[in-house]
Amino acid sequence: LIFYSAVFGVLSRRGGHRCKEGESMNAALRRDADVILRSSLNAVLPDEAVRRALRDLRPGKGRVLLVAAGKAAWQMAHAAVETLGRVDGGVVVTKYGHVKGEIPGVTCYEAGHPVPDANGFAATQKALELVQGLTAGDTVLFLLSGGGSALFEQPLVPGAELQDITSQLLASGADIVEMNTIRKRLSGVKGGRFAQRCAPAQVFSIVLSDILGDPLDMIASGPAVPDTSTCAQALAVAERYHLALSAQARALLAQETPKTLDNVTTRITGSVRELCRAAASACRNLGYEPVLLTDQLCCEAREAGSFLGSIVRTQAGQGKKLAYIAGGETIVHLTGKGLGGRNQELALAAAPAIAGLNAAVFSVGSDGTDGPTDAAGGYVDGDTLAALEAGGWSGYAALQNNDSYHALKAVDGLIITGATGTNVNDVAVALIGEKTPPVSPEVSPEW
């Protein structure tokens, strides 16, 4: 199911959709989901946010250089150069497939994510060469978005070892704060070290947040922010997840990062809170009564899906359209060998609870990427469980094998957007149609 293309149009449909003759009762919910996702993602595209933040820029009398890193780096850099008119040089490093064209005065690179690669190392080196030898009158415009931890990297251990440590962290179930606490100490640019390399030039940093609570030193591992994490915390993370580390890596974890920086001004723009509010507004425009459950969701993906499914069952039967919205970033502990992502797992886990109901649950990553797949997330409704069983699929077995991608693909439940140009965590929505009857609380199926 392709809900929308990578180029978004502004939608303003109101009142929701009604089922057409001969359609499943959930067909209208699927169309509503399309509108909600379009509207939500349009609201957090970085272009206008960058333009607003640049109103506070007071460049010195010297050169203005641009460095942008992350999944939204190209869009942020494009908006910045359009706004400023020109820059005296620049480097963009973003994920493969995310460069949309040339930007005057700026060299664009694509690199690996979520595991860093040689292209990212080379692009980061170009950025470091760009900011060498600056004066106090120069200004570095630093545009940062999620994904920068992998894309913007100068490893202090051999590149292959850094890739292995990153893969260990991704598979461990460590949250993003724990992961970045380790990454900072193995890098020549993270944890405030990039800003140190720019001194004495002033760094004006615009940050698109992809971490709950917007902790600046953790977004893309904080290349231009004093680090609040400690060596003791880094060593504790390594111990907690039994990371296999070389003696060199362990020694780096014991070295402190910069705790003060006097050459940086930071503006944060865009967050999961804005994404959730936009989803609520879109739901309201379609005739739903929206409830924002949280914008700090950070549990296991399948638990979040089961929770949303249980809300549907307990709130069904009110004779009106209801929407429950949760934003954040769930985690997945990899135990199987299948293919999927946290948003796909969340959606699939909700399927048994809403089976047979006029209801839907969908979850999407705002950057258009969910795990190592071409999908942004997943969609299920009251018809999904029956469709899986008719196709010979066990949803439970798919979850146990972390194979939500293939299960959802079999029932037309993948959400595919392509690169969206933004990155502000994930949003999950449960929709309850007005045709849903009351459900007995004693019957609550789950996998």
PLM ranges: what are they?
Residues 2-7, 11-24:
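Short, Lys/Arg-enriched N-terminal segments with co-localized hydrophobic residues
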Residues 25-65, 74-84, 114-136, 269-274, ...:
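N-terminal glycine-/serine-/threonine-rich phosphate-binding loop
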Residues 67-69, 91-94, 141-146, 205-211, ...:
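Short beta-strand segments
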Residues 79-89, 103-108, 128, 132, ...:
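A glycine- and small-aliphatic-rich helix-loop capping segment at beta-alpha/alpha-beta transitions
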Residues 94-137, 178, 182-183:
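Glycine-rich oxoanion-binding loops at beta->alpha junctions
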Residues 158-244:
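Internal gly/pro-rich beta-alpha loop/helix module
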Residues 201-204, 226-307, 311:
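Accessory alpha-helical/coil subdomains and C-terminal extensions
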Residues 348-435, 447:
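Internal helix-turn-beta structural module
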